[in-house]
């Protein structure tokens, strides 16, 4: 008799029972560990290292999640955020597959950084997206050089993921963190809007104002906080970004 296949394990940073900003309706939000990006505004740098996460199987997480199913209504479900969920793509696909088998709406909150159209990785991404109802794509900066400064990574694969999601008609929300002196210039916002307007699958655009609530975590981990001295955007700049990006629900 062949040995029983070992169940996949994911490394989880934290869980949120009643998420209201991570997808439609009320969400059970699973924050995974591990991320290759080093966003200067990251408020969870303690998620960067996958090894610090708590191991869970898909069944264990779903057992926790369905306790709150009565609060989800027609719109709610589970959202996997991070960290970067696509770094644990095999586990994530298994989790979403089992969730869909129970009729649970699945949302992927991703930076898009691990995306590629090449090789086995692309096949895994395609399998994941088949069991993903909604993708929330975080576009940190439209300018590639500025994106590298802000996150340590290129934005080319991120923008290509947006294009691919458009090609396959996968529902998508786009979120953009508004950081003074980094991503809030009108030129950048106008270019980002033009890119978003070229896509046909975007259901919603959101501006997320930069905040300093996670700055203390950098210091606790022994890291220098790169945005020291930069204040959150003013209401005027937030309003300006919302106007330039035509934020809100799209038909």
What are these regions (language model features)?
Residues 53, 84, 150, 181, ...:
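Pocket-edge positions in alpha/beta enzyme catalytic cores
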Residues 35, 85:
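Hydrophobic adenine-recognition pocket in adenosine-nucleotide-binding enzymes
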Residues 1-21, 173, 178-251:
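Auxiliary Fe-S-binding modules of radical SAM enzymes
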Residues 66-70, 74-77, 86-213, 220:
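Conserved AdoMet/S-adenosylmethionine-binding subsite of the radical SAM
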